[in-house]
Amino acid sequence: MNAREQIVRVLEEVFEQGGYSNIALNQALEHSQLSDKDRSFVTEVVYGTVARKITLEWYLAHVIEDRTKLDPWLYYLLMMSLYQLVYLDRIPDHAIVNEAVQIAKRRKEGSEKFVNAILRKLLREGLPAVDTIKRKNKRYSVEYSLPVWLVKALIEEYGEERACAIFKSLYQRNKSSIRVIDLDEKEELAQLLEATSSLLASSALVKEQGHFAAHSLFKEGRITIQDESSQLVAPALDLQGDEWVLDACAAPGGKTTHLASYLTTGKVTALDLYDHKLKLIQENANRLHVADKILTKKLDATKVFETFGPDAFDKILVDAPCSGIGLIRRKPDIKYNKESADFVSLQAIQLAILDSVCQSVRKGGIIVYS
């Protein structure tokens, strides 16, 4: 499977199966034989296509009468090809079209003619002008690929000028950050990875760009991908090594494994509602060699006190479910999975979780709410 075929597969998983873009991408690249150059290309196009989804759909709607008649993979092939045509200037247009045609031909004989016709029509006629959209919120929605409700909410909260600055900031390139498992190796790994020490977290290394999930150090469990701010959470619990710790909302396990790294005789109980998310925690724990410190349990975090009773844990982490809006730049698919009504329901869930877990912490214990 070549790089562009890999991109289509990842987009199918994200848009059709509801997968997380970062996890779907990491898993795909972990099992691929692509070169480092191709891995970087796949990463850029996957995140770019997901981030620009609304914009790309608007463009395609002008040349495709009914997308529901298309196989999903075919539509995502067109979407990722259009992303390259619009936003990447280092690849010749004819090469992008030719690659898309070849992929279509391999997957479904005859579909290559449709792909060729659509992409060449867009190149020949040019893209429709976004500034012709009369309704302001809709125009910003298409221009910045944001749901209309979010555009409206941000303008109401911050005013149009500042909101537009926020919209633009969502497309600034993220730095890649990792957590070094053995701090004695930090300097050595920084040189090896050509990364620099974080100014925020003592265990973090940062780099302008890079796909660490494909690196042998990641597979060996010597590094793991984790945001700098996320790495500040575990130290806040002031773990001494022998505590019984609860991670009430644990998936995918980044903070759970970080907590476990501080323990000697203690244990972390990691909760989640879904089996596939518990599996992610277990996979991370195995890779980072802390599986013996982690107990996973399928449980609604609002049922902690009902299940474990009083004084069950020395320390508790509540990484409560939230809108995730602040993570859009790093996890662009978040913005398509939320609605304004979610904010109200999330508040009730957050309070219910906190009300339950606070009854299960021992006297003198610590609860960190993040």
What are the roles of these predicted feature ranges?
Residues 1-370:
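S-adenosylmethionine
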